[in-house]
Amino acid sequence: MRLVQLSRHNIAFPSPEGALREPNGLLALGGDLSPARLLMAYQRGIFPWFSPGDPILWWSPDPRAILEPSQFHLSRSMKRFHAKSPYRVTLNYAFGQVIEGCAADRDEGTWITHDIINAYLRLHELGYAHSIEVWDNDTLVGGMYGVAQGTLFCGESMFSRAVNASKTALLVFCQEFSLRGGQLMDCQVLNEHTASLGAVEITRRHYLDELGNLRQQKLPQNFWVPRTLFMPQV
């Protein structure tokens, strides 16, 4: 296993099975963030993640964290909160604001650079990247974004500026996604937060098999049309 240097003139990727074991899943570096290359990466179970000032790094970890939307774990406290939620949840209303919210400075810094923002804005304009917004009246208080692959959604990042805002984004999206035929969410790497919401780990091989199948399937034609997914009870 060795780290592969990508060409700027060829969007092909090496097999994810050749990724390093340490750091887990690092597959290649270089290339660019063009829409064609990003889409090729997602189709092969690969995603970019790198720190400001570093070269573009491409990953395909083993194991892979996934969440079946129908298996979202709703805690008692979250169930009580959501029953009286003050939030309105929308789809594809404010992609730029959501990715900017995810990129806002945090204690640990951010990997969402201006280049990443511009790259995913292009994917959104092309109809591949999507956002879920959580509003308190007309103020954006949370959200998430990711890339669609048929009936699989590759979650990239989320943010929260109010109590349970990001959980609300994920909960409402999972409910709608599952209801309309969505099968799987890619969470990339398991952490305490996603595990508490029902995410589990599967092998990379299993994930790639699921990806190959699910990206060929289709959601209803109008699924990604900007719309309201949830309104607070009056």
Curated annotation (Swiss-Prot):
An individual GO BP term: protein catabolic process
Localization terms from the record: Cytoplasm
Top EC class, one word: transferase
Entry's EC annotation: 2.3.2.6
Main location (coarse class): cytoplasm
Reactions listed under catalytic activity: N-terminal L-lysyl-[protein] + L-leucyl-tRNA(Leu) = N-terminal L-leucyl-L-lysyl-[protein] + tRNA(Leu) + H(+); N-terminal L-arginyl-[protein] + L-leucyl-tRNA(Leu) = N-terminal L-leucyl-L-arginyl-[protein] + tRNA(Leu) + H(+); L-phenylalanyl-tRNA(Phe) + an N-terminal L-alpha-aminoacyl-[protein] = an N-terminal L-phenylalanyl-L-alpha-aminoacyl-[protein] + tRNA(Phe)
Superkingdom of source: Bacteria
InterPro entries named among the record's database cross-references: Acyl_CoA_acyltransferase, Leu/Phe-tRNA_Trfase, Leu/Phe-tRNA_Trfase_C, Leu/Phe-tRNA_Trfase_N
Coiled-coil stretches noted in the UniProt entry, renumbered to this chain: none
UniProt-recorded Gene Ontology molecular function terms: leucyl-tRNA--protein transferase activity
GO cellular component: cytoplasm
SUPFAM superfamilies: Acyl-CoA N-acyltransferases (Nat)
Keywords in alphabetical order: Acyltransferase, Cytoplasm, Transferase
Function description: Functions in the N-end rule pathway of protein degradation where it conjugates Leu, Phe and, less efficiently, Met from aminoacyl-tRNAs to the N-termini of proteins containing an N-terminal arginine or lysine.
Family per record: Belongs to the L/F-transferase family.
Protein name per Swiss-Prot or TrEMBL: Leucyl/phenylalanyl-tRNA--protein transferase
